[in-house]
Amino acid sequence: MANIDIEGILKQQQPYDGRVPKTKIVCTLGPASRSVEMTEKLLRAGMNVARFNFSHGTHDYHQETLNNLKTAMHNTGILCAVMLDTKGPEIRTGFLKDGKPIQLKEGQEVTITTDYDIKGDPEMISMSYKKLPVHLKPGNTILCSDGTITLTVLSCDPDAGTVRCRCENTATLGERKNVNLPGVVVDLPTLTEKDKEDILGWGVPNKIDMIALSFVRKGSDLVNVRKVLGPHAKNIQLMSKVENQEGVLNFDEILRETDAFMVARGDLGMEIPVEKIFLAQKMMIYKCNLVGKPVVTATQMLESMIKSPRPTRAEATDVANAVLDGTDCVMLSGESAAGAYPELAVKIMARICIEAESSLDYGAIFKEMIRSTPLPMSPLESLASSAVRTANKAKAKLIVVLTRGGSTAKLVAKYRPAVPILSVVVPVLSTDSFDWTCSDETPARHSLIYRGLIPILGEGSAKATDAESTEVILEAALKSATERALCKPGDAVVALHRIGAASVIKICIVK
């Protein structure tokens, strides 16, 4: 950490000065935020990615929300990526007699049956996982209803399809509550039939940008999902959510196969000891940073803002520490989907991110990234790291990357420059003018989960030489950057682009 002083800490909050955090913000859209008016407010407040949670809602409901988002993007001119978060495989308790909650008392014994037709009572409850008596053994723990009920396994009878347990605490159990089996390897598919229907029936037709996959347990899960996507796989990023011990154990192979990663601390926090969650978060973020894959930190980041206009001090510190750990994105769930202050939550999250980013020692981060990158570097990685080194040495205010698919700009982002990266998605040029629109926004929207990357869409052309057309695009990019207050006349800007077969890094002075 750097740039920390007493005066800076004590300085009163300043009015909004136009600064935008490098860290991206993912917002879950729901009843509190799905209107065109509120979605516009979230976009202006700093939302970069809209999350559609398919654990809730119908296709028609989500379609209406997406249509509202598209209208809001058109009205504001702000680009936003679309994330489909799958419900994933789950184990739930069954229905209860008369639909009434039951009281479980500490020390009492209860039988669990895999016959889901049985209506539960204090002596017997059902669970939806058929192989429960096969995979559990005496001494295992079963957590129900978000961990509020702990059951210890006493015996298993696979033939009868039952498990005998002891209740470790007094609590009330309602119908269809979630179940976690810490440390138990379960035999459930990563994609359920519902997930496939959501992805192929809603996600693919709507050209979504990314899928957040719940309960990824091994690298082959991602290979199978890409097979399901078929030809659409190349346009949809896969974001893995590791939410159990098996996934943590296989983290490295999952990281090799995934496009992005989400540290989903909710279910993970019930699978591993609560005092180890911070270690898992730091390990996952660090490993994602080393390979240049974007990582989202999620769950309960500003949870109290569902009801309160101010976060708790612990929540504010949690968001800042995720930024210091190296996260690319921070995420709001209930805060933006169903909270009383969705816009304020985004604004506060953005302010916290800006403060945390200003305290980072970017020189030390760059050295660590260089030290940890295997040699020899690929030509593209060598160029990307050199562009960041040049920007650091020249005290540049901005890095501009002209790219067709976005991969060069993403590699620049891996080296965490202290300045923003303007990623200009360059089309094939064919006319005499340059216009800031693009028929295919996919590469630009994919950039919206990388820290520090600001994508700009370009469509246009020049019948001139490659070198001349590049200069036209670069000049337009610098003009756009000036309008966005990313730089001003007299500032040094590092540009990275290709001319023919050669790659060029140069320092430009903004006119």
UniProtKB/Swiss-Prot annotation:
CDD domains: Pyruvate_Kinase. One of its GO terms (molecular function) is ATP binding. Gene3D superfamilies: Phosphoenolpyruvate-binding domains, PK beta-barrel domain-like, Pyruvate kinase, C-terminal domain. Transmembrane segments: none annotated. Coiled coil: none annotated. The keyword Cytoplasm applies. InterPro entries: Pyr_Knase (IPR001697), Pyrv/PenolPyrv_kinase-like_dom (IPR015813), Pyrv_kinase-like_dom_sf (IPR040442), Pyrv_Knase-like_insert_dom_sf (IPR011037), Pyrv_Knase_AS (IPR018209), Pyrv_Knase_brl (IPR015793), Pyrv_Knase_C (IPR015795), Pyrv_Knase_C_sf (IPR036918). Its main location: cytoplasm. Its EC number is 2.7.1.40. ATP binds at N53, F54, S55, H56, R92, K177. Mg(2+) binds at E243, D267. Its cofactor is Mg(2+); K(+). It is found in: Cytoplasm. Substrate binds at R51, G266, D267, T299. Homotetramer. Belongs to the pyruvate kinase family. This is Pyruvate kinase, cytosolic isozyme. It comes from Glycine max.
